[in-house]
Amino acid sequence: MSQASSTDTPFVIAGRTYGSRLLVGTGKYKDLDETRRAIEASGAEIVTVAVRRTNIGQNPDEPNLLDVIPPDRYTILPNTAGCYDAVEAVRTCRLARELLDGHNLVKLEVLADQKTLFPNVVETLKAAEQLVKDGFDVMVYTSDDPIIARQLAEIGCIAVMPLAGLIGSGLGICNPYNLRIILEEAKVPVLVDAGVGTASDAAIAMELGCEAVLMNTAIAHAKDPVMMAEAMKHAIVAGRLAYLAGRMPRKLYASASSPLDGLID
């Protein structure tokens, strides 16, 4: 998918430029064929994979997800879903690098509990610091706290990914004001991660000025995942164009579209 506009700045992650600003996950689909078709329909170029839950080569006797999303076609973004402390998360990233032949790009997420799946920001900061020291390019799932987002960027994370709502909730953009503060201060790309439920949510995230959006459940749990994937592709482009175009100001009173001056009485 091409850039939204010829005047747009490129979307760059770890030195590589991408045409699509939609990143997608691979979980919760009914089978690998549906996974493949939905990802193709989304136009995504970066696909995230839960290393602890998905076979990407560590189990030779099981179906390998990389047969469906080949690394020569997609940028594989291994993530640490299912990790609840920094030690686990760092170990998982090191395993991913080994399985993917030295691949340094990772998505860090350290969860606080199974009920909310909120990020444990204390453990996230610890893990991020170690991973950056180890030479990883870290994209990091975090809360919508602007201070934590700033600290993660200062540590050396290449992108911060604040939640818009709880993972898998479909609640949409719950706190656009915090996201705006993060975006105003950002010195690295900001991507919404978690909470998107439908195409309008993705468009809103992009209209706020986010560089991109990552989603999984919104597509995989739709009645028609392949169709929703295509809807999300268009929503991302529409939202980015709207952001670049600039929204009209809100007004308390009406303003006629057609002037009355010069009309025949």
Curated annotation (Swiss-Prot):
The keyword Protein biosynthesis does not apply. Keywords: Cytoplasm, Schiff base, Thiamine biosynthesis, Transferase. It is an enzyme of class 2 (transferase). Gene3D superfamilies: Aldolase class I (3.20.20.70). Its main location: cytoplasm. It is found in: Cytoplasm. It comes from the Bacteria. Its EC number is 2.8.1.10. One of its GO terms (cellular component) is 2-iminoacetate synthase complex. Coiled coil: none annotated. One of its GO terms (molecular function) is thiazole synthase activity. Pathway: Cofactor biosynthesis; thiamine diphosphate biosynthesis. GO terms for biological process: thiamine biosynthetic process; thiamine diphosphate biosynthetic process. PANTHER family: THIAZOLE SYNTHASE. Catalyzes the rearrangement of 1-deoxy-D-xylulose 5-phosphate (DXP) to produce the thiazole phosphate moiety of thiamine. Sulfur is provided by the thiocarboxylate moiety of the carrier protein ThiS. In vitro, sulfur can be provided by H(2)S. Homotetramer. Forms heterodimers with either ThiH or ThiS. HAMAP family: ThiG. This is Thiazole synthase. It comes from Pseudomonas aeruginosa (strain ATCC 15692 / DSM 22644 / CIP 104116 / JCM 14847 / LMG 12228 / 1C / PRS 101 / PAO1). The gene is thiG.
